[in-house]
A protein has these predicted regions:
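Active-site- and interface-proximal helix/loop "cap" or "latch" segments in soluble metabolic
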Residues: 2-140, 183-276
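Short, compositionally biased leader-like segments
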Residues: 138-177
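Two-metal-ion RNase H-like nuclease active-site motif
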Residues: 178-182
Length: 276
């Protein structure tokens, strides 16, 4: 099975930021879009389209009035849950969550509209408001590269941010499966490889960083090896969060690890269904 998710943002000439997330996978093809004010991030439009589900090409979707007025920022989860209370639409909710993540990442190019006098003031605000949120922000006293050292001084005024997440699963050996996951965006790049047995036992879990704000981030790659020996089909979100999240972890490594393990578990369950 395969899964490819792309998200991006663009600033318009009407004081808006638009965000789009597109998921193309073996199971479905879906698009979500939001438009928000560039200064407040208040959502003004929200629409989605389901173009394919499985082998069925039966478009559905529409506007999401419940999201109008919500802030596309930290704390948006309750609004997303209210907009999509049916568990059957969790995948739609997750697409809008990807749109919000893209808006969040774009703020670094909109700090003037957001009320910050300079990039330094914006960076200082993040230092104060996100203490111990990841290994980077837990060790600001020893990091060698600060945020604007990493991304450079050049502004972006049109296309602001791009992110691609890709997962592929295939048979490995006589009975096992291998999954690869890649996370690539405007600021970060990390990949994972997971091997598991036919019963779901994780035999290998490797992660590699190619780009990150500081080399201290690269050390989080070793955290995922704590999941070796665990069963993919029995892991829950808390297990994965405990491994790669928190003050010594990395949200982006956690993100692609979740996606990769979820796709691997889905493939194992599909094989189990065929064997019954």
């Amino acid at each position: 099975s395969q899964r490819s998710l792309r998200s991006c943002t663009r600033q318009t000439d009407k004081g808006r930021i638009t965000a789009e997330a597109v998921l193309l996978s073996t199971d479905c093809e879906i698009v979500a879009r939001i438009a928000a004010a560039a200064d407040t991030f208040i959502i003004e439009q929200a629409v989605w389209e389901l173009l394919r589900q499985g082998a069925e090409y039966a478009p559905s979707g529409g506007a999401v009035p419940a999201l109008i007025g919500a802030e596309a920022y930290f704390g948006v989860a309750p609004a997303l849950s209210r907009a999509f209370p049916d568990p059957a639409q969790d995948f739609v909710r997750e697409m809008f969550a990807e749109c919000v993540k893209a808006v969040l990442q774009s703020e670094t190019y909109l700090y003037t509209q957001r009320g910050f006098a300079s990039g330094q003031e914006y960076q200082d605000n993040w230092d104060v408001s996100h203490p111990d949120s990841c290994r980077y922000y837990s060790h600001l006293d020893i990091v060698e590269s600060r945020w604007f050292d990493h991304i450079g001084p050049q502004p972006r005024t049109g296309n602001l941010f791009h992110r691609h997440k890709n997962v592929a699963v295939w048979r490995c050996g006589e009975a096992g499966l291998q999954a690869t996951g890649s996370f690539l965006d405007s600021f970060h790049e990390v990949g994972v490889v997971v091997d598991c047995s036919a019963t779901g036992s994780i035999e290998r879990f490797d992660a590699t960083f190619m780009r990150a704000p500081d080399r201290i981030c690269f050390g989080t790659a070793e955290l995922v090896q704590d999941l070796i020996g665990k069963n993919v089909k029995q892991l829950n979100r808390r297990d994965i969060n405990r491994c790669a999240g928190g003050g010594e972890g990395c949200a982006h490594l956690l993100d692609i690890s979740r996606d990769t393990l979820a796709e691997l578990a889905k493939s194992l369950n599909a094989i189990d269904g065929l064997c019954r």
